[in-house]
Regions:
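Solvent-exposed alpha-helices and their adjacent loops that cap or buttress functional pockets
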Residues: 49, 116-117, 141-145, 168-172, ...
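Short glycine-rich phosphate-binding loop at a beta-alpha junction
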Residues: 88-98, 180
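PRPP-dependent phosphoribosyltransferase catalytic core
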Residues: 9, 14-34, 167-223
Length: 223
């Protein structure tokens, strides 16, 4: 979360991204350009942790954009297929903690269906707490006990949101195969998740997205 007072501001960067040797795929290059253009914001911010930041990445401005969602879906599904094959697992469903995972999971699920309708990949969303009415669900959507799932998240920092989703899924009887993230901030989150035995596959790292000149003081914050 992000704390901002009235003297602080965010300006979207509608500029051409600096050339960085990242992924070779043209789809990934286009997605990176959209992320930098739509989601990288600059200002003076105090994060909930108390850390100071002069920029943050609001990844939801990208994952909720139709063109970017198409790219996230195609790239994400490619990574799901490659990683599942390498690890010898069958994936039943894709999801994660709301809201960071929601658009991303659905985009990948749609891409999976378009690529292979017979794969029957489903999607779901993990609430931060169970509903207090109706069926009192914490996991909404297409998830069943005993399924093997891929957890997704738009940005990981400490990994807490992803770990919350993993805990909820495992408590509900699911098996987590691995984790796909859009942006790894490289601030310990990946290591925290992998310490629990779950591989993390990022589409972009902080360095991929912003280069090596982001500055030690700067952090990518989750809005």
């Amino acid at each position: 979360m992000l704390a901002v007072d009235s003297t602080r501001y965010c300006v979207l960067t509608h500029t051409t991204p600096q050339p960085i040797d990242v992924k070779s795929s043209s789809l990934e290059a286009e997605l990176r350009a959209i992320l930098v253009d739509k989601s990288v914001c600059y200002g003076n911010f105090t994060l909930a942790s108390g850390a100071q930041s002069d920029f943050y990445v609001d990844a939801k401005l990208t994952t909720s954009n139709p063109r970017a969602a198409l790219l996230v879906g195609r790239i994400g599904w490619k990574l799901v297929k490659q990683t599942a094959t390498a690890r010898g697992v069958h994936v039943d469903s894709i999801g994660g903690l709301t809201m960071g995972a929601d658009w991303m999971a659905l985009s990948i699920g749609i891409a999976a269906y378009l690529d292979s309708p017979s794969s029957d990949i489903q999607t779901f969303s993990v609430r931060k707490s169970a509903k207090k009415h109706g069926q009192h669900k914490r996991i909404e959507g297409n998830f069943l006990k005993g399924q093997t799932v891929v957890v997704v998240d738009d940005v990981i920092t400490t990994g807490d949101s992803t770990l919350q989703a993993i805990e909820a899924i495992e408590e509900a009887g699911g098996r987590v195969a691995f984790v796909i993230v859009l942006v790894d901030r490289q601030e310990g989150g990946r290591e925290a998740i992998e310490k629990g035995g779950h591989a993390v596959v990022p589409i972009f790292s902080r360095t991929d997205l912003l280069g090596t000149n982001a500055g030690r003081r700067s952090h990518i914050a989750v809005a």
